[in-house]
Amino acid sequence: MAPSAEGASGAPTPEDLKLHQLSQKYTAEAAKRFRPEGLGQFIRLKEVGNERFRALAEDPWVDHAALNAKEPVKDGSRYKFIILGAGYGGLLYAVRLAEAGLASGPDDILMVDAAGGFGGTWWWNRYPGLHCDVESYSYMPLLEETGYIPKSKYAAGPELLEHAYRIATQWKLHDKALFRSNVKTIRWDDESRLWSLEVTEGRGPGQQSRELKLQARYVLLASGILTNPQVPKIPGLETFTGPVFHTARWNYDVTGGSPTDEALNRLEGKRVGIIGTGATAIQVVPKLAKYAKELYVFQRTPSGVWWRGQRPTDPVEWKTKIARKKGWQRERMLNLDSYLTDAAEEGQENMVADGWTEMPAFSAVIGSPRHGIVEPTPEKIAEHLGRLYKLDLPHAEQVRARTDSIVKDPKTAAKLKAWYPTWCKRPTFSDEYLQTFNLPNVHLVDTDGKGVDAANPSGLVVADKEYPLDILVLSTGYVTPSIGGGSPAVRTGVDIYGRGGKSLDDKWQTHGAATLHGVCSNGFPNLFFTPLSQSSQAANNAFTLDVGTEHIVQVIKTAEDRVDGDALVEVTSEAEEAWSFEIMKHAGWFASVTGCTPGYITSEGEALRKSEDPMEMAKRARSGNLSQGMASYMKLLQEYRADGSLKGFDISSRA
């Protein structure tokens, strides 16, 4: 559905006509990229049939000897809390539990992660050029509590990984983690009223894995949104004979350098290809271009690239303007979010003042408190889309004009322009990427939305032209967290069975999302998950994690205090249905994605497919979010917790 070409008086204005023409251009560009297989055009790296490619998913950073030297977790061990994930989300759970007085004993917490250490996405991703794309003062968790001062406005990958270890050290979590481990099943035992987990712990090459059965009173799911690298199903890809790797598992043995040394000297004299032009490639491409003899950038959909403005942290500014009072980091998160949700008040201080704060139309996918609920009628949705397109137009045109001003070759510049609304793909920021295409050794291979046609032993094929390569880099992203309707079980990659052996995934597939506040589901007592569906999201994922973990831990704390410890906490079916109905009322807002190009946000277009099945339509609506933005969601949760009643939960003593 496109915004209407008619103005308020009924006659189209010049701006209305321009917006209508733009929406038609967007629609045409999106149509080029739709593929009937949707998510099926990709496969998880660890599930690729070819053994050589499947091995690319293995952990290149793990120190097996050091981990094997630690005292092993005993089979049959029981914990108060088992947290699945040891990235920033899992660490926030552990810290919040400790600060609430819920986890002071040696067997109170166990964090389980497939990685070889703390850090989550910052453990796995160590590619050259890696930085967080959100300001580090707002993104890096617990800065106020640790007293750490980031080195620059946008922290580099090694610093982000180091910060995870800083948190683990300060809260003494090093001996409360089980790494290299995959949880296969989580099953509720009605008799013991405990969760039973089947876990496989890897021990490294030549070592037999350990099969463990663990028990927990509470299970907290902290799986991230960038955890499962995917690769496109390009015919013949497995026949390519040169080195190949995914950006999420960078191979410095091939490129030279290291995570802290971006001198990729082994690329000298090499023809390098990189597939993908998303948020990762924006950072990687300039680094590859410095050393490769020839660099070929294979593009399906260009990214909109805005200015970055990286700079070192000024100690005086930090003390006087940033960390100036208690609660400064939450305030800064809220301030950034207000600009992205079109909620900034006239004259308010712009604390972050970067490219993110110049795109209020991003509210199209995260919500805004400014406009209320959008009625799901054709007229109201068209009006809503028209307002969003109008809001986005100045910024979108500036982004495209910036491309023209930087890229010297007009044909290349035209191919690098993003013809879709700002909110359809993760916005990117760089003061190097576009400039790279002015270098004589860098070649843009635009596939006009089709993607790479095929691969052979010596390179890639696009539009019947072969591009010989020595090395191939896959910057092809991650499995969308909304796969499986956003089921926490699918997202975590674990089979979860609640009361009576009921499968959490089956519940999602049959009825759609069913939660209270997006964090727990009836039939699965003492199981909580980080908000995704039926909650709210922020461009700054650390804000989402901060709000979600705070709420979950406070709910548990209140329940434990009520029964003097050993609580059983379960949302009622009535409460989750009432919450699901509330979520469905907000679905009209997210019609904003109807004009989007296929990608991560739209599940490669699957979220845009029309359905006449009322059940399917209801399931989709239930899987949405609140449309007023993260600040409104946070306030709702705070008000909910304020009276201490925990309305909608059944709370009893487990004993």
Curated annotation (Swiss-Prot):
Biotechnology: The polycyclic ketone monooxygenase accepts bulky and complex substrates and converts them with high efficiency, making it a promising candidate for application as an industrial biocatalyst.
Alphabetized InterPro entries for the sequence: FAD-binding_Monooxygenases (IPR050775), FAD/NAD-bd_sf (IPR036188), FAD/NAD-binding_dom (IPR023753)
Gene3D superfamilies assigned: FAD/NAD(P)-binding domain
Enzyme Commission (EC) number: 1.14.13.-
Temperature dependence: Optimum temperature is 50 degrees Celsius.
SUPFAM superfamilies: FAD/NAD(P)-binding domain (SSF51905)
Highest taxon above the source species: Eukaryota
Residues involved in FAD binding: G89, D113, A114, T121, W124, C132, D133, Y139, V183, T492, N541
Keywords: Disulfide bond, FAD, Flavoprotein, NADP, Nucleotide-binding, Oxidoreductase
Disulfide bonds: C424-C596
A Pfam match: Pyr_redox_2
Physiological role: Polycyclic ketone monooxygenase (PockeMO) that displays excellent enantioselectivity, acts on various ketones, and is particularly active on polycyclic molecules. Breaks C-C bonds through the insertion of a single oxygen atom adjacent to a carbonyl moiety, yielding esters or lactones from ketones. PockeMO is able to convert linear ketones (including cyclohexane and to a lesser extend 4-octanone), cyclic ketones (including cyclohexanone and cyclooctanone), bicyclic ketones and polycyclic ketones (steroids). Performs oxidation of the keto functionalities at both the A and D rings of steroids.
Name of protein: Polycyclic ketone monooxygenase
